[in-house]
Amino acid sequence: MASLLSVENLQVQFQTKKGINTAVDGVSFSVEKGRILGIVGESGCGKSVTSMSILQLLGSNARISGGSIKLDGKELIGLPEKEMCRIRGNDIAMIFQDPMTALNPTLTIGTQLMEPIMLHQNCGKKEAWTRAVDVLKRVGIAAPEKRMKEYPHQLSGGMRQRVMIAMAVSCEPRLLIADEPTTALDV
């Protein structure tokens, strides 16, 4: 079976005041369609950096210094940002580790949920609203219509994490990366 995602010999380096720091060195794995892969390791071992590399969301002081990241055989490293924007959310989505900082505090939950739906699902505001409310229900948020009009600071940490999960699955991506998705959940 062909891999949906293939990461081969990935190397990521950060430029620091003290010089070059290699955060990921030689990571390789593949994920087939319909499969689940868990990457475990101690804090600081490069799990999140690997995930951010796949999405090409590394900071300006970081660079992929070697290796390959392929989605359905297509190399992602070096793709123009415009093309990566089409891939993010639509083909690959991520549940980020920290819902406290991942949501924009100046935008309502509804605005933040509707944006990727309108962008990737080619629908208008009314349909995006309906889909966003539905996905909030699916992740266990009570009174989703009310929550759509609220700002992140008005929600508990667990509810914010559920919003992050809803945002990640809202466009039904082919690959979902979950970086400690249950960290803040009230379960």
Describe these PLM feature segments:
Residues 1-186:
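ABC transporter nucleotide-binding domains
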